[in-house]
Amino acid sequence: MSGKSLLLKVILLGDGGVGKSSLMNRYVTNKFDSQAFHTIGVEFLNRDLEVDGRFVTLQIWDTAGQERFKSLRTPFYRGADCCLLTFSVDDRQSFENLGNWQKEFIYYADVKDPDHFPFVVLGNKVDKEDRQVTTEEAQAWCMENGNYPYLETSAKDDTNVTVAFEEAVRQVLAVEEQLEHCMLGHTIDLNSGSKASSSCC
């Protein structure tokens, strides 16, 4: 186990009011503010953690969900290692907009291989009683759009918040491991000048 910390940039994306700032603040500071205002532009917080023996510094970027802040938030997508697509289970429109957020991120982050980029989907505010999106609907969307992990969270009562960010780290590490395996597999036989066979990628 290496003592060197890996810096990972994670972006929280979703409609305004779904609780992105609250999730970030709950995870980093373990506080919840029911009177929190909408984010203007972007803000970020760091947290150090250890996941499966790897030391990681998670740089969590919270973005403004309103359309009028699009030009402020999109430059910060570049360099992201993972994207947490977030909706509120009591707001059906925020769920239906997930595909738009996914496309916006892929375009502005200039993702080269969208099929293998680590997205995690969060259904937030599960503490609310008047839910408009079922667990099954959300899971089906994840399966259809990239087989993404789906977690239901609540920043208010701290349901699955830590689990969600740790899952983001695991997804990034899994992709990195796969890439390393691919690179090792694509070796060149110097005698023949041809690439050795590889079952990867």
From Swiss-Prot:
Q: Name one GO molecular function term.
A: GDP binding
Q: Mind listing the UniProt keywords for this protein, alphabetically? A: Cell membrane, Cytoplasmic vesicle, GTP-binding, Hydrolase, Lipoprotein, Magnesium, Membrane, Metal-binding, Nucleotide-binding, Phosphoprotein, Prenylation, Protein transport, Transport
- Lipid attachment (S-geranylgeranyl cysteine) is at C200, C201
Identify the residue span(s) of motif Switch 2: 64-78
Name the residue ranges of motif: Switch 1. Answer: 31-42
Q: How does it sit in the membrane?
A: Lipid-anchor
Residue positions where Phosphoserine is found in the record: S34
According to the record, the protein's activity is controlled as follows: Regulated by guanine nucleotide exchange factors (GEFs) which promote the exchange of bound GDP for free GTP. Regulated by GTPase activating proteins (GAPs) which increase the GTP hydrolysis activity. Inhibited by GDP dissociation inhibitors (GDIs).
The catalysed reaction is: GTP + H2O = GDP + phosphate + H(+)
What PROSITE patterns does the annotation carry? RAB (PS51419)
The record's annotation in SMART domains points to: RAB, RAN, RAS, RHO
Q: What is this protein called?
A: Ras-related protein Rab-9B
Q: Which organism is it from?
A: Mus musculus (Mouse)
Quick one: which gene encodes this?
Rab9b
